[in-house]
Amino acid sequence: MIEFEMAEHDYIELHSLLKVTGLCDSGGVAKLLIAEGLVHVDGEVETRKRCKIRAGQIVAFNDRRISVI
């Protein structure tokens, strides 16, 4: 599991999270994968590219999980 620390921000947009954690090569690829329903947030399919991810949430994609702290 990848741990992503929010630091000083309240949230990060879903497509940006996939990019900065290295699970996607670019934001464009991340947006496409999200739109195709391949990304889960807290166990539910998420299709909103700009979904606000906050501390305590779990994002899953391609058998990888990101814990946002």
Where are the predicted features?
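A detector for short, charged/polar N-terminal pre-domain segments
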Residues: 1-12
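A basic, amphipathic helix-loop patch mediating RNA/tRNA/ribosome contacts
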Residues: 12-52
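Short, Lys/Arg- and Gly-enriched loop/turn segments at beta-strand edges
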Residues: 65-69
